[in-house]
């Protein structure tokens, strides 16, 4: 079933190697920072791979404008940064899993 003697042990070894690689990639993802933008770059939000906002940059010209518009742009920049983080995570995990797809709704890291 597992290719004879040592087959199961070899399978377990491969699973452990993959788990180790995934742990390293997850650490790398957590350290990664992505910047999302809104309003043609007037609002920028930098977020870590753990979805923690590290920095918000607002162009001074927006300080005179409508408060609601500024709030909308900040939210849009946060969403853009989160989307970029998700795309980066998918790419990094696909490298580890050899493109093996996760079931719908299952996110990395577990």
Curated annotation (Swiss-Prot):
What Gene Ontology terms describe where this protein resides (cellular component)? Answer: bacterial nucleoid; cytosol
Q: Where in the cell is it found?
A: Cytoplasm, Nucleoid
Family the entry assigns: Belongs to the YbaB/EbfC family.
Q: Which GO terms describe its molecular function?
A: DNA binding
The question of whether Cell membrane is a record keyword is answered with no
Q: Which SUPFAM superfamilies match?
A: YbaB-like
The membrane-spanning stretches of this chain are: none
Q: What does this protein do?
A: Binds to DNA and alters its conformation. May be involved in regulation of gene expression, nucleoid organization and DNA protection.
Question: Tell me, how does this one assemble?
Answer: Homodimer.
Q: What is this protein called?
A: Nucleoid-associated protein Sfri_2406
Is the keyword Kinase assigned to this protein?
A: no
Q: What's the superkingdom here?
A: Bacteria
Return the InterPro entries for the record.
YbaB-like_sf, YbaB/EbfC
Keywords annotated in UniProt: Cytoplasm, DNA-binding
State a single Pfam family of this protein.
YbaB_DNA_bd
